[in-house]
């Protein structure tokens, strides 16, 4: 696996962001993460990539203040992948030190607090909130392959403090009912998220100012 550290951190962020829209009352540090590595151990370099994946997951979770509740390792003959699932612990943790910022009575459900599609309100705003300060990268994506940039750097996420700040603010807005609808930018990127939010409708989206707002000139 190329960029195992990048991929692992992005998968952690994806699992946590999927809980962002859930009905309930909780903070980021209330959540626990379960991990599953499906890994092909035969190709040369794959075990080094596995080590990198495990190391990056532990370091990133530590930076986020989120505990790893359990993990599963499965040998695979088809490829290597890692998946994460975020939820509240069913019983109080006996092995983990409590965070002073945890909610007193957190709860969560499978239902969403807000829908994932746009609402028909002309007074509302559509806001894109990046949860990291990393530059935009397209390496390994279908879009990059279509444009012949197969060797570019893969997307990354690496600033846990910035992620925490964004998460707590947006989560509070979701719980207070201020956010009318929300969608996670994950697999497929911004275009896929926009398509999901459109539902059966359409959207004219101008994103040419995203890179300039980041002062990012490297398009590889």
Where are these regions (language model features)?
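Active-site pocket-shaping loop/turn-to-helix segments
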Residues: 2-6, 153-162
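Small-aliphatic-rich amphipathic alpha-helix that forms the alpha element of a beta-alpha
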Residues: 5-27, 31, 55-62, 169-172, ...
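Conserved phosphate/anionic-ligand binding catalytic regions in large, soluble enzymes, centered on
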Residues: 12-27, 118, 122, 180-197
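A generic local secondary-structure boundary/capping motif
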Residues: 21-22, 58, 74, 112-118
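Short, surface-exposed loop/turn segments at secondary-structure boundaries that line and modulate
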Residues: 26-44
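Mobile "lid/hinge" segments at catalytic clefts and subdomain interfaces of large enzymes
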Residues: 38-41, 82-158, 171
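Glycine-/charge-enriched secondary-structure boundary and capping motifs
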Residues: 40, 46-81, 92-100, 152-155, ...
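A general structural motif
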Residues: 103-110, 157-167, 207-215
